Amino acid sequence: MSLKGNARATFLESGDPALKDYYPAWVNNLADDVTVEGSLLDGAVQGPDAVRKVVLGIRSLYERQEFRFAGPCGNNGFLEDYVARVRGEPLGCVVLVTLNAAGKAQHIAANYRPLSSLLLLSRLVREKLAGTPYAEQFAASESSS
């Protein structure tokens, strides 16, 4: 992947070894009306079963995932910053989870980089979720676009 200048993109770096065994507990603590949105899809997906299926579907496509940061953000949020590989391509993601008053994940916003890896992952997620009502919110394969 070519980059201009001497800057090194953070999605090319490794994760924090202290977070090697981290698992996002919020995935199992979703509000009844939870939503997920982000750069991988158009619009949002709502409902705990649908959101869990999307999130776990994305994670299943990773060859590896290393967290750089995971921790509280503000009074009612949680932030994750991680790097991953999808079909050998580097990927970075920042996830902001907003918690409701009961401490359940109410809203998840996930933003991926770089664009080439984002598009690849979005197409793969669409294939993985084929047959669900929200599969078409992800990018179509290159041959059908």
Predicted regions and their residues:
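C-terminal and inter-domain tail/linker signature
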Residues: 1-145
